[in-house]
UniProtKB/Swiss-Prot annotation:
UniProt pathway annotation: Protein biosynthesis; polypeptide chain elongation
Name assigned to this protein: Elongation factor P
Example of a GO biological process term: peptide biosynthetic process
Lineage: Bacteria, Bacillati, Cyanobacteriota, Cyanophyceae, Synechococcales
Gene name for this UniProt entry: efp
Family per record: Belongs to the elongation factor P family.
Length: 186
């Protein structure tokens, strides 16, 4: 059980038979009446977002999520196949379960797969990944004086804003949490 006072962004709770993740929260203490916690919750399975208000100190069941490190091995008929490298057991996830993570997912990458009651729910990527630029405008000499950026398409299909001096074929490090360029990689 977890108190509504202990909610933080990313906290997972069980509500109405499914897992919900706290996206936003705000502790409100009105001048008259008791305090409450206003939250924005996202259903992990379906992706639905709802706003819900809880009394301050209200106890809710915390979702017991299991994380396991699996390797993305291949795609088959729209499903992403992951393998546990110690037991060689395969786990299949749909494109909906992968969500926005698929724009950085490539074969051979190790990720955390989050499960609830033995059912895989979602994929957690590393905070940063190294990917190759496959398409971008060429950099023109003298463009760097302003320190501008240009769009680049990476090997997984993701689009990221990169500095003007980068060209096709270079490997860059990208932050998967906010889709930002972190630097060149050798």
């Amino acid at each position: 059980m977890i108190s509504s006072n202990d909610f933080r962004t990313g906290t997972s709770i069980e509500l109405d038979g499914s897992v919900w993740r706290v996206v936003e929260f705000l502790h409100v203490k009105p001048g008259k009446g008791s305090a409450f916690v206003r939250t924005k919750l996202k259903a992990v399975q379906s992706g639905n977002v709802v706003e819900k208000t809880f009394r301050a100190g209200e106890m809710l069941p915390q979702a017991l999520l299991e994380k396991s490190t699996l390797q993305h091995t291949y795609m088959e008929s729209g499903d992403y196949v992951f393998m546990d490298m110690s037991s060689y057991e395969e786990t299949r996830l749909t494109a909906q379960q992968i969500g926005d993570s698929r724009k950085y997912l490539k074969e051979g990458m190790e990720v955390n797969v989050v499960s609830w009651n033995g059912n895989p729910l979602e994929v957690e990527l590393p905070n940063s990944v190294v990917l190759e630029i496959t398409e971008t405008d060429p950099g023109v000499k003298g463009d760097t004086a302003t320190g501008g950026t240009k769009p680049a398409i990476l090997e997984t299909g993701a689009q990221v804003m990169v500095p003007l001096f980068l060209s096709v074929g270079e490997k860059i490090k990208v932050d998967t949490r906010n889709d930002s360029y972190l630097g060149r990689e050798n």
